[in-house]
Amino acid sequence: MPDKPARFSKKPGKQGGTLAQSFSSIKHELYAGHIKYMLIFSLAPIFPSMKDSLIADAYPLFGFDSIFLMGIAYSLGIGLLFAFAKLENIARYARHVAMFMTVSFMLWLVLPIGPLATFAGIVFSLLFGGCSGFQLFGFACALNDTERLVGAAITSLFCLLFQLFIALVPLGSKNGIIFVALQVLVSAKCLTLYQGQDFEHIKNKSIEGHGKQLAPALFFFFAHRAIVFFYSYLPTSPSLLISGFSGLVVFALCIIIYVAAEFKIWHMCNMFFAGMAVTFILRLLLPNSHGALAASITQGFSHMGFIASYYLLGLVIGKFVNLRLFKWVLAVIFNASLLLHIIPGLLATKAPEALPLVGTLTTMGLFVLFTLMMPLMSQQLFIKAAVQENAQEKHQQLALNYGFTAREEEVVKCLIKGMTYKQCAAQLHISQNTVKFHALNAYRKANVSSRGELMALFLDE
């Protein structure tokens, strides 16, 4: 992780750049070897009608539909299975959980509809939740800020494209199963590629003073999940095509705003709340198919919230959380999600007509709380401290002239201090291989062949 909170703003010399140049700079901060940590498909948002398609083949148990019980098992599994993880064996443990998860999914598919299949589905959901915990850990601790943004965006785009696909190629009641199968396939493949060395920097990590930064990000993450969970229990949109297409428009708007606003996530958070508030109000004021159709256009803002929430969560976890605290974070935010399954689920069963009103009040209430927390969140998450030292400014100007990425700039700072690769890795919370990769790139861009030449180049200035 970088020393600074995040690259929410550009360097002064970059502010006049075009959108194309900004997108190009993002590309240079992506490392192909990290794709396995970027694809958090086990945490992908659900699409309208997915839940209904799964319920169609579900066998109720204890008076509840199996999908409701599987949702509870999923939330429990995220924190429960990761609680036994240790840094020494985390990659091997993740592979084993992924293997058992895949087997249980296949078992759930082949068993005839009945109590046994429902039980297999609950076991699968528990293990799938465990995989989500590992994927969130890799997402937060092995990636830089840009990779997290792109990873969350790809995961959201996966959901939107699948939604458009089933709108154009109807799969009937099987669309939910196929979506879950794709999640399982990608997640299992990514988890089998995890490498323990990418998490070595967590071992001796200090977490002093983490609370002020962690709390606002956890609030926004929980708020996003609460709003989306309530909306998922409303009757589905009459047009998946319109919902999917509008979601793609919002997705494109999300990325453009992020880049045009100089890499600030703040605007995405505000637009998520505003968009979802409008969505619930439309469902409340127009309780018919026309209201559902109108709401499906603005419902795409939920994807903006997904990207922003996981970006911020990954940011604060990667910088301020060690393994022990990460387990507590999982227990708090995902086990608390049990209420987000139970409350709207029971409400949908006992008083479905009250769901739009309760969802609207919940969204507006969380929006008000978010507004009240703006000063704290602005100070802790959205403002990068100004650089004051002249030597620092000179270093940044040279890095800009040579076209260094943010990570390469950080590695160079460590190298010219005389640090070894191992010390650089500990300082930046990345692996030694990653340090070597960025150091060689910096040598090439600066047209030097050794650390001595690099030090002379910067220190002479």
Please state what every model-predicted region is.
Residues 65-85, 248-256:
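Central cavity-lining transmembrane alpha-helices of secondary-active solute carriers
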Residues 116-133, 291-306:
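Hydrophobic core of transmembrane alpha-helices in multi-pass small-molecule transporters
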Residues 3, 13, 41-53, 105-106, ...:
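Linker/hinge segments immediately adjacent to helix-turn-helix/homeobox DNA-binding domains
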Residues 418-453:
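Recognition helix of helix-turn-helix DNA-binding domains
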Residues 146-168, 327-344:
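Glycine-rich segments within core transmembrane alpha-helices of 12-TM secondary carriers
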Residues 80-96:
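Conserved MFS/SLC helix-loop-helix module at the cytosolic interface between two early adjacent transmembrane helices
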Residues 406-411:
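The N-cap/first-turn positions of alpha helices
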Residues 128-152:
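Cytoplasmic helix-loop-helix junction between adjacent transmembrane helices
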